[in-house]
Swiss-Prot record:
Assigned GO CC terms: extracellular space
Chief place where the protein resides: secreted
Entries under Gene3D superfamilies matching the protein: Pancreatic trypsin inhibitor Kunitz domain (4.10.410.10)
Subcellular location: Secreted
Protein's UniProt name: Kunitz-type serine protease inhibitor vestiginin-4
Signal peptide: 1-24
Keywords of the record: Disulfide bond, Protease inhibitor, Secreted, Serine protease inhibitor, Signal
Disulfide bonds: 31-81, 40-64, 56-77
Described purpose of this protein according to its UniProt entry: Serine protease inhibitor.
Pfam families for the chain: Kunitz_BPTI
Upper taxonomic lineage: Eukaryota, Metazoa, Chordata, Craniata, Vertebrata
Sites annotated Reactive bond for trypsin: 41-42
Length: 83
């Protein structure tokens, strides 16, 4: 296969990966955790996955501790947790 064909195949596989939603069986367990602002007093606008509403929602993160269900960008939250 030519290098152009391999590049096209790689591009198509990457596109498929980005566009394929996460199924609930593939979703990481931390996506089920509740939002957790943590004890610090920062005001960081971040996102968490709300498993009851099946969507990523914004919340204010204090900047320390909290849990893994915490994303800087909604796209990252959707890619990781949303089905």
């Amino acid at each position: 296969m030519s290098s152009g064909g391999l590049l096209l195949l790689l591009g198509l596989l990457t596109l498929w990966e980005v566009l394929t939603p996460v199924s609930s069986t593939d979703r990481p367990e931390f996506c089920e955790l509740p939002e957790d602002s943590g004890p610090c007093k920062g005001l960081f606008h971040v996102f968490y996955y709300n498993s009851d509403q099946n969507q990523c929602l914004e919340f204010i993160y204090g900047g320390c501790y909290g849990n893994a269900n915490n994303f800087k960008a909604i796209e990252e939250c959707k890619r990781t947790c949303a089905a």
